[in-house]
Amino acid sequence: MHGFLGEFLGTMVLIVFGVGSGAAMNLKGNYARHQNWTFICLAWGLAVTFGVYVAGQFGSDGHLNPAVTVGFALFGYLPMANVWPYLLGQFLGAFIGAVIVIIQYYPHFQAAKTAADGNQVGIFATGPAISNPVFNFLSETIATFFFIFVLLNLGNFTQGLKPLMVGLLIVVVGQTLGGTTGFAINPARDWAPRLAYTILPVPNKGLANWGYAWVPMFGPLLGGILAAGLETIIS
């Protein structure tokens, strides 16, 4: 199970801070409500930074993202033996991270009686600003492609200041390409919290919009594969 613990802990940190920022910004009755898109992008960027640092200390490459893992593995940047431990750690860590956010904000979910009070699946998972399945899919593919293409050129991104560079990359992707879909660019970041929201007793919750969930699953996976493939061809 090489790297499982690092991916589990790193992804858990990522989701606690990232989804936590969504809860803070949206839920009625907390001091951070009504922040803006820049707040969200910065929070997710720093969440990735600290998640990568944690993962690297526990024996993984700090992927925290199935799109990274699958793309890297298919083109020889990661041993195939590491794929399933990494994926399991990522999805399980993301689920537990979402559970922690639910516990942290439980009274606020209770107070948020309607969607206008901020209690909606968008705290946990992504959704399109304008619903257009084809272009939503392309948006996730393109955003993930550029994220992973740059990532491949950072080398070992768990060491030194590299995790900060990864975090800044997330901020740039979010600010420039993420406004269309909320930039999942990570199937585990979307599916595991969406599942937690679906099956756990979150007070006053709405629908989890599983009809959209194929977009943040397969768009990022395709983007990661294309980025790793291009890097292999040109390097």
Swiss-Prot record:
It comes from Lactiplantibacillus plantarum (strain ATCC BAA-793 / NCIMB 8826 / WCFS1) (Lactobacillus plantarum). Keywords: Cell membrane, Membrane, Transmembrane, Transmembrane helix, Transport. GO terms for molecular function: glycerol channel activity. It is a multi-pass membrane protein. The chain crosses the membrane at residues 4-24, 39-59, 62-82, 83-103, 134-154, 165-185, 210-230. GO terms for cellular component: plasma membrane. InterPro entries: Aquaporin-like, MIP, MIP/Aquaporin, MIP_CS. A motif (NPA 1) lies at residues 65-67. This is Glycerol uptake facilitator protein 2. It comes from the Bacteria. Belongs to the MIP/aquaporin (TC 1.A.8) family. Transporter that facilitates the transmembrane diffusion of water, dihydroxyacetone, glycerol and H(2)O(2). Is not permeable to urea and D/L-lactic acid. It is found in: Cell membrane. A motif (NPA 2) lies at residues 186-188. The keyword DNA repair does not apply.
